[in-house]
Structures are given as structure tokens and as C-alpha cells.
Amino acid sequence: MALMVLMALVGCSTPPPVQKAQRVKVDPLRSLNMEALCKDQAAKRYNTGEQKIDVTAFEQFQGSYEMRGYTFRKEQFVCSFDADGHFLHLSMR
């Protein structure tokens, strides 16, 4: 009986393997196209030129991408893309 309890405890004491998020390298051409589309959409939303839009961050999630940026007036926004890089929406922050 003690042997069975000991074996049960040994099985419980081993920590589960650490899972790490998979990072897929984004094609540079795709990310440049996404940035251009984000700048275009932000310029339309904020009624300004694309040259006055700065994209400052690019984040990859499990099934989507986000690009963060701001206008020359320091208005912040986030562009969201699906897993294939298609534009979903622009959120003002």
C-alpha cells in the first residue's frame, strides 16, 4: 500500500513541460504591405497625409497581428489584421 502511495506521489511531483508560444517569422514584404495599409487607413481616419503617420510597434498574436502608431498630433491608433495579413479594423486610442 505504501509503495502505491509513493508511486502516486512521484507521478504528481514532476512539473508539466513548459509550453512556449510559437513565433512564426513574418515575411518582410507582407509586413511592409500591412504597414502601408495601416498608414493609409489611419491617414483617411485622421484626415491627414500618410507621411504624418508613424507606425511604432508590430505585435503578432496566435491568429492576428496588430500595428500601433500615432499621428503628428499624438493621436494613437491600432490597426488589426487577420492571420493572413488582411486588414480588419483601425481602433482609435
UniProtKB/Swiss-Prot annotation:
Location in the cell: Cell membrane
Gene Ontology cellular-component annotations: plasma membrane
Signal peptide (from-to): 1-11
N-palmitoyl cysteine lipid modification positions: C12
Record lipid sites (S-diacylglycerol cysteine): C12
Coiled-coil parts of chain: none
Membrane topology: Lipid-anchor
Pfam families: YsaB
Superkingdom of the source species: Bacteria
Tagged with keyword Lyase: no
InterPro entries xrefs: YsaB-like (IPR025728)
Protein name: Uncharacterized lipoprotein YsaB
Protein species of origin: Escherichia coli O6:K15:H31 (strain 536 / UPEC)
